[in-house]
Amino acid sequence: MAKIVRIKGEIIGKDEPMVFTKEYNVVKEDDALETMYSEMGSKHAVKRANIKVVEISEISEEDIQNPILKKTLEMY
């Protein structure tokens, strides 16, 4: 059964820390972490060691902030 996971964190090592929030529809929290590390490392050219995860939480469909994820879930 899939669940929606919200990851809050920051990228350190740049001029200023960059705060981010990402939401994923995954089976395991580990899958969400791996996807987040891959996306953030690719987009911002940072190593995994420079990405600090502050919070990982499972959320309900009503709490989704990402409009693309929300529309995708509405289709099913």
Curated annotation (Swiss-Prot):
Disulfide bonds: none annotated. Keywords: Ribonucleoprotein, Ribosomal protein, RNA-binding, rRNA-binding. The keyword Signal does not apply. One of its GO terms (biological process) is translation. InterPro entries: Ribosomal_eL20 (IPR028877), Ribosomal_eL20_dom (IPR023573). Part of the 50S ribosomal subunit. Binds 23S rRNA. This is Large ribosomal subunit protein eL20.
